[in-house]
Amino acid sequence: MGCGLNKLEKHDEKRPGNIYSTLKRPQVETKIDVSYEYRFLDFTTLNDAELPGSSAIKLSSLRDLPAQLQELYQQGFVLAAVHPFVQPTDEKEKTPQEQIFRAVLIKKTERSPKGGIHSEGYILEVECCSSVNQLSDKKEIPDFIKKIQDAASQGLKFVGIIPQYHSQKNCLVSSSLTPASNNSVQSRDNKNVSNCPEDHASLDGEKIDGINGCSTPAPGEENADQCATSREGRKGEGQAAEEPDCKSAKGSKEQHEHPGGREAPDTQNGVAENETPARCSKPLTDKTEIFTLFNKPKTPQRCSQYYTVTIPMRISRNGQTVNSLEANWLEHMTDHFRKGGSLVNAIFSLGMVNDSLHGTMDGVFLFEDVAVEDNKTTQGYDAIVVEQWTVLKGVEVQTDYVPLLNSLAIYGWQLTCVLPTPIVKTNREGNLSTKQIVFLQRPSLPQKAKKKESKFHWRFSKEDMHNKPMKKSRKTKLSSGEKQTAEKQEFEVTENTRNLAAQLSAASGPGPEQQLDSVINLGNETAGADSRGTLHDGVSEGTCPASADAGDTGGSEVQACPNQSAPNCCEEQEAAGQDCALGPDSCQGIDGAAADVEPSCE
């Protein structure tokens, strides 16, 4: 796919990354009816001892994420994508960069509001659906997709997946750790994000994953109850189960009065929080769980349908280190975008390698299918794919895709997915660089806008194409308008030929019969051309005129433009059904009639 955006040199270490698009740059920077606004939140499940000096929000569990995003959801933002900064590898020891995540929230703004229609509110739900081992095996992915589709049939909109790592050290951490609610929510742009102090909203849907099977006391409680059911006993089950109501979990045994806190679940704000254990009776050893995130609309909407697209990717290694990851993204995705598919998320791991020798592997990309309604045409999409190099100084982000998203937001480009990779390089300053694949899409521009943009590029060729039918039309009109004149000229040519023959017979000179035959042939050819060809002001285009004065019926003067070999030439061309066009260089007077005939030629 061609992209009009400028690309930097391949070996330039400072380049932000390659950019691919289905549009040229002027079209990319064309505004549409909507624009977007973004918010960014970095968080981790590591504690201060494990991740010192990081500004990322510390969460005791990924189930606390809805509480952190509560205020942004109240402002109309919804979660668009969530991802780790570095794609986890198969190594047992996880790096801090693999356990730092980013949540990207988006808010849609209409340039011309329609009748005060308010955008639909959403509720964020987090569910644990499987262990990471299931996603490493391609055979298990269809079952995973089926679980997502089952949730979608209940009205949920899939956002993404995120892993949570459990080690023996993490599981034995007591509740004396700083609760997630005590951390102030800090976004990258420091706008409209503040702390929700000690405020935990319960799950609006009253649906909590049954794998954990734990009930959680109030956030400030020092002594937490032990888990009723160990996660270890349900490892790999991969199914979400119904649990008792969140209100019943705050029964007489677990109900505690927290100073400054609110016990009542905040279901009106649309933020859901699942309860998590502060300490487990049976420690977990290096276990990883996959959590799925859904946006649940407050009002019933059409159920989403999802399908997968497999895209081959090429990786190169240096031992166990992955040096590069490449794919023809738009070659495999453009057709789905044009048909109305919307990219949601991508699944791949190094355990899905097809051919270790050539370094090929399949990435599974999840699309939301278009809903074709009655009397409505399918809305296609254009896309941008950015291979972004994100630079981390320790655990702090120095360079990322945030400026790019903010610059494209005013043109209506929506972030759909961020695919992390296991590529990690160290630059000269000692900072880490990792590649992230950023996907954006936008409704296709109207055809008028596309034609307007390309008008200058094709201006000259289009004028030529426009002039051709104009010439044909003009020729047709002139031919029909001069039809009677052509018939009249044909009659005059015949009369002039007879008069000329009479003059030649009386004149002296060699070969009068040959000269007469030449004139007769020329007259017949001219008459045929006048009846067949196109006339401009009484003169046939592309042929020499037999008579310059159509109104001269006396035949006193005749103009001719014969060649010395005109008889043979015209006879051969007439036999082939062609016109006899004589050039100006061949114009000569007729022997024996020089006094009566003046040679002339156009």
UniProtKB/Swiss-Prot annotation:
Residues 197-209, 244-265 have a biased composition (Basic and acidic residues). It comes from Gallus gallus (Chicken). It is a lipid-anchor. The lineage of its organism: Eukaryota, Metazoa, Chordata, Craniata, Vertebrata. Pfam families: Raftlin. Residues 178-195 have a biased composition (Polar residues). This is Raftlin. Coiled coil: none annotated. It is found in: Cell membrane. A lipid is attached at G2 (N-myristoyl glycine). The keyword 4Fe-4S does not apply. Keywords: Cell membrane, Lipoprotein, Membrane, Myristate, Palmitate.
